[in-house]
């Protein structure tokens, strides 16, 4: 049975054969339509509560059959469902005890369990039999009524009061059915058979948790005898973007005489901008309002207008509908995309709908947090990867100002990409198979019909990672003809250039910046966007600056970082990843790619993004401000600027608010007011910050949007103060002074005791470290294999020599070691100790004989775990690495040591602070201070060692026995072009053959 035949007549009986028929994807559904809101009165409209909508959300009854063998005839009115359990709608079944969540990326969930090919489905196909009892609201009694499922995964059969209603697929757009003739005023029984798998599952192979259920709202929609079925509003700009034009196309259910309408356009204050009145003589209402006095919509200035359409019969209001619109022009000219005449750069992120507790049943609170945090992080665009989101999300993007790529629910990644990235499209769908055209095209149509009125949506995307073929070419043709006001996108053609015309954008995933530059400098025909880039898995997003530097090329129009939020599911207070639910096959921690953690707290990566995505580019040089205004529509005078002077990390001066007026796209140099600073005062930081001048929906007045600083560097140098007493015994060297004692083992070659005021600070022998707990990117790049020789090299260093030398104001203890790795000379550590207990440590690495990379070089110290607090002067407040310094600034920062551990889904290298001048660890009794000695110092203080972190699969497995200090001369970058092969960029790597030196001073921290 083809879907064409299904649509020609009403089908009264369900058929399980539909589950495996790609040509049957909707049965008895009504045509998709706009997501406008309708009300029965003016009062309802103003309150925002409609009596024409009845929610069926809440507690439903359910029988869950893992094997797909559910109760027979459960949909019958007289069926006994007293043994059914309770389930929440909206909600994912697997998070409510029905089945288990499963995380896979490319592979299908059944891979290795059954050998099946499209459109076959697994023999084990879980079935959820849902039941909901309800009484019909009185406002519905005299109206036509539809039943709408906003999101259901994956295939649903629907019955009402024993009557078959219809069938739906496409998990992420509504399935809506007319149910008027089946309804009763009271005691209605709605039954839904939801199957986890159908032929549609081959088109829904997105990189996410595979979960099922009624995960979006279920509602009844009442339709008065005069009813707005569909509304298309094309809001554009004319007269050099100074005036507005509104083209109105309304489809009205017209069943009454003497019908009329009134259309109003109102601004954000509710004031009338324009109106149109007239009779209704047919189901189609079309007209244009021109020369409207409107302000343009953009992400910078999201000016919205409310269109209200009133429907009357003989002068009585039967229905009023509303839709927010933004007037804007989005155009593709000469291979470049323009918004309202300005070349646009997308500073974007990909975003899954995800909540760590609720799965895909996310809340309005989740959405608002995401959007506000994006705006505060200078993110101006979001790609709905890889399916249409809830309608509310687009309304919020319209309101707060985000540019959107809306993407059809279509991904068949596992049908063509095989192990190791090998491509084999032999059973790729939809490909060239016309049996899949209807289902594929319906997904695009459903999305466009629902979302067409949202100003925030600039680009329609056909889907994700599904290769290419004639079906996509047909889809692209439909999109461009149906909506010439937007640009059409599809990245999959990069794998089959025969279908290059199926996208208007040159879109690539994870292309290195140098590869992109080659395209941009060779007569590009299309605009370029990195639709996925800077893979943010774990400790990542290194060298994002290489990509933002491409903005100088007109055809480079930005990109979308993968991705926004870690997909970690919470259970028993812990965040878990693939495999933790005994789900197999699985792709484990690959679901942890977020700029924010799964609990919606910000990761350190986000500060880097905020700095590099800023529309105000600031540079302080020679005391002057170099300012570039990359906004498209906002003068820099809309912000105020502050200059601040810091000496040794302490604020000594701050200016009054300053204003610098640059039009969008302009650059300028401005003299700044600075007080005189004597050279001997210390290290001086000249800082400029840019702030919001007024409250905005996403941040308050004074919020910092950008900053920059110039440092007149002055690193501390060790100067000994008096000589300690020396006790040179057979097995140990002892050094004593005023209230301190240090003991060096002549056998081990390390200090074995460090006491200040009688307190022991060394809990274990120090060790050399050349390693770090592997990051997700390290694992993906193969560094665990390539650099394995360094993992335990420091642990097994062998003492070659130890000696001491008495100097006038200090005592030198010199040690030399060999490693199980061939070096160009001895590995040495020199300790210069003065009479006050200060220890200047100098560790020299001579370089390895064999070429290769060195992860890090420095020392590990195990200190008392009671040292729970830190305070330091260096780059902060976040962890930083040589390829991810942006967004951190010199200052004095403090907090709890445990907070230095970033909770990546799988534990890995974390907590490093760069350009440290001094670092204090303490409790109420005192502590230690580590100070740079004439050279940059990297330092981390954590409750766990690198070895513990490396061995752990989850943070909750770690135990805190000591406070671990890693003092490093250098550490390689974290990388981030991708997480499955790309190496850290060479300029951020450490050459193992190069000599390195660590210099720092350790001294007691005395608290008053």
Curated annotation (Swiss-Prot):
UniProt keyword annotation of Hydrolase present: yes
Keyword RNA-binding included in the entry's annotation: no
Known catalytic reactions: Hydrolysis of terminal non-reducing beta-D-galactose residues in beta-D-galactosides
InterPro entries: B-gal_small/dom_5 (IPR004199), Bact_Beta-galactosidase (IPR050347), Beta-gal/glucu_dom_sf (IPR036156), Gal_mutarotase_sf_dom (IPR011013), Galactose-bd-like_sf (IPR008979), GH-type_carb-bd (IPR014718), Glyco_hydro_2 (IPR006101), Glyco_hydro_2_AS (IPR023232)
Location of the active site: 465 (proton donor), 532 (nucleophile)
Any GO BP: lactose catabolic process
Molecular function per GO: beta-galactosidase activity; carbohydrate binding
One GO cellular component term noted in the UniProt record for this chain: beta-galactosidase complex
Keywords noted in UniProt: Glycosidase, Hydrolase
Description of how the protein assembles with itself and partners: Monomer.
Assigned protein family: Belongs to the glycosyl hydrolase 2 family.
Name by which UniProt lists this protein: Beta-galactosidase
Organism: Lactobacillus delbrueckii subsp. bulgaricus (strain ATCC 11842 / DSM 20081 / BCRC 10696 / JCM 1002 / NBRC 13953 / NCIMB 11778 / NCTC 12712 / WDCM 00102 / Lb 14)
């Amino acid at each position: 049975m083809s879907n064409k035949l299904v649509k020609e007549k009403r089908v009264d009986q369900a058929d399980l054969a539909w589950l495996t028929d790609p040509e049957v994807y909707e049965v008895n559904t009504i045509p998709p339509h706009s997501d406008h809101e309708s009300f029965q009165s003016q009062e309802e409209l103003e309150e925002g509560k409609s009596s024409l909508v009845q929610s069926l959300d809440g507690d439903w009854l359910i029988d869950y059959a893992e094997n797909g063998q559910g109760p027979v005839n459960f949909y019958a009115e007289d069926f006994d469902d007293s043994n059914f359990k309770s389930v929440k709608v909206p909600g994912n079944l697997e998070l409510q005890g029905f089945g288990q969540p499963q995380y896979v990326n490319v592979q299908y969930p059944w891979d290795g369990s059954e050998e099946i090919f499209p459109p076959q489905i697994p023999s084990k196909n879980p079935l959820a039999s849902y039941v909901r009892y309800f009484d019909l609201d009185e406002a519905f009694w005299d109206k036509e009524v539809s039943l709408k499922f906003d999101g259901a995964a994956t295939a649903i059969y629907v019955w009402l009061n024993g009557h078959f209603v219809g069938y739906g697929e496409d998990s992420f757009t509504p399935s809506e059915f007319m149910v008027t003739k089946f309804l009763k005023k009271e005691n209605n029984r709605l039954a839904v058979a939801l199957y986890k798998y159908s032929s549609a599952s081959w088109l829904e192979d997105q990189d996410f948790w595979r979960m099922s259920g009624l995960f979006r709202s279920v509602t009844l929609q009442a339709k008065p005898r005069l009813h707005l079925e569909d509304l298309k509003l094309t809001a554009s700009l004319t007269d050099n973007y100074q005036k507005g034009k509104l083209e109105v196309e309304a489809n009205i259910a017209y069943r009454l005489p003497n019908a009329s309408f009134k259309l109003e356009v109102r601004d954000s204050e509710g004031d009338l901008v324009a109106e149109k009145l007239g009779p209704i003589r047919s189901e189609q209402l079309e007209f244009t309002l021109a020369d409207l006095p409107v302000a343009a919509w953009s992400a910078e200035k999201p000016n919205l207008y409310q269109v209200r359409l009133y429907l009357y019969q003989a002068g009585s209001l039967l229905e009023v509908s509303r839709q927010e619109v933004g007037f804007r022009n989005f155009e593709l000219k000469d291979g470049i995309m323009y918004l309202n005449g300005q070349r646009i750069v997308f500073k974007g992120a990909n975003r899954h709908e995800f909540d760590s507790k609720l799965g895909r049943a996310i809340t309005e609170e989740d959405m608002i947090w995401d959007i506000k945090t994006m705006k505060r992080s200078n993110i101006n665009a979001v790609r709905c990867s890889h399916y249409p989101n809830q309608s509310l999300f687009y309304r919020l993007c319209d309101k707060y100002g985000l540019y959107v790529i809306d993407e059809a629910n279509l991904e068949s990644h596992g049908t063509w990409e095989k192990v190791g990235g090998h491509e084999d499209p032999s059973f790729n769908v939809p490909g060239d198979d016309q049996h899949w055209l209807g289902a594929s095209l319906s997904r695009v149509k459903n999305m466009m019909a629902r979302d067409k009125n949202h100003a925030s949506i600039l680009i329609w995307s056909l889907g994700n990672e599904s290769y290419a073929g004639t079906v996509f070419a047909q889809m692209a043709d439909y999109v461009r003809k149906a909506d010439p006001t937007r640009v059409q996108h599809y990245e999959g053609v990069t794998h089959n250039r025969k279908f290059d015309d199926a996208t208007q954008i040159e879109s690539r995933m994870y292309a290195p910046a140098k590869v992109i530059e080659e395209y941009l400098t060779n007569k590009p025909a299309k605009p370029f966007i990195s639709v996925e880039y800077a893979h943010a898995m774990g400790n990542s997003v290194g060298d994002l600056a290489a990509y933002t530097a491409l903005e100088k090329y007109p055809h480079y129009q930005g990109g979308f970082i993968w991705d926004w939020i870690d997909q970690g599911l919470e259970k028993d207070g812990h965040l878990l990843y693939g495999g933790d639910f005994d789900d197999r096959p699985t792709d484990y921690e690959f679901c942890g790619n977020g700029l924010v953690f799964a609990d919606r707290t910000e990761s350190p990566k986000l500060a880097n993004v905020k700095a590099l995505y800023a529309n105000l580019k600031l540079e302080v040089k020679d005391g002057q401000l170099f300012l570039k205004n990359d906004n498209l529509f906002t003068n820099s005078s809309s912000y105020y600027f502050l200059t601040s002077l810091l000496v040794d990390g302490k604020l000594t001066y701050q200016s009054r608010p300053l204003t610098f007026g640059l039009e969008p796209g302009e650059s300028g140099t401005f003299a700044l007011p600075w007080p005189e600073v004597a050279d001997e005062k210390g290290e001086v930081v000249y800082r400029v910050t840019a702030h919001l001048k007024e409250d905005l929906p996403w941040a308050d007045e004074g919020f910092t949007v950008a900053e920059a600083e110039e440092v007149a560097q002055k690193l501390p140098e060790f100067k000994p103060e008096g000589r300690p007493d020396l006790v040179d015994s057979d097995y140990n060297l002892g050094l004593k002074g005023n209230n301190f004692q240090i003991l060096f083992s002549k056998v081990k070659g390390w200090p074995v005791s460090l006491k200040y005021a009688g307190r022991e600070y060394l809990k274990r022998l120090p060790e050399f470290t050349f390693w770090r707990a592997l990051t997700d990117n390290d694992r993906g790049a193969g560094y665990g294999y390539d650099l394995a020789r360094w993992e335990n090299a420091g642990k097994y260093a062998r003492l070659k020599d130890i000696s001491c030398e008495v100097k006038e104001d200090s005592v030198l203890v010199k040690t030399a070691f060999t490693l199980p790795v061939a070096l160009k000379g001895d590995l040495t550590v020199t300790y210069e100790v003065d009479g006050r207990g200060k220890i200047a440590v100098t560790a020299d690495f001579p370089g390895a004989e064999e070429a290769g990379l060195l992860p890090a070089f420095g020392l590990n110290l195990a200190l008392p775990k009671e040292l729970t607090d830190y305070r330091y002067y260096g780059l902060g407040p976040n962890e930083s690495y040589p390829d991810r310094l942006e967004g951190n600034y010199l200052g004095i920062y403090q907090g709890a040591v445990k907070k230095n551990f970033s909770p990546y889904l799988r534990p890995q290298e974390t907590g490093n602070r760069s350009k440290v001048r001094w670092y204090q660890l303490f409790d109420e009794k005192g502590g230690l201070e580590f100070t740079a000695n004439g050279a940059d110092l990297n330092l981390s203080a954590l409750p766990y060692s690198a070895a513990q972190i490396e061995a752990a699969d989850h943070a909750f497995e770690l135990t805190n026995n000591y406070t671990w200090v890693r003092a490093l001369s250098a550490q390689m970058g974290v990388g981030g072009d991708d997480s499955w092969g790309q190496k850290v960029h060479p300029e951020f790597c450490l050459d193992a053959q190069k000599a390195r030196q660590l210099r720092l001073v350790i001294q007691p921290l005395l608290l008053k």
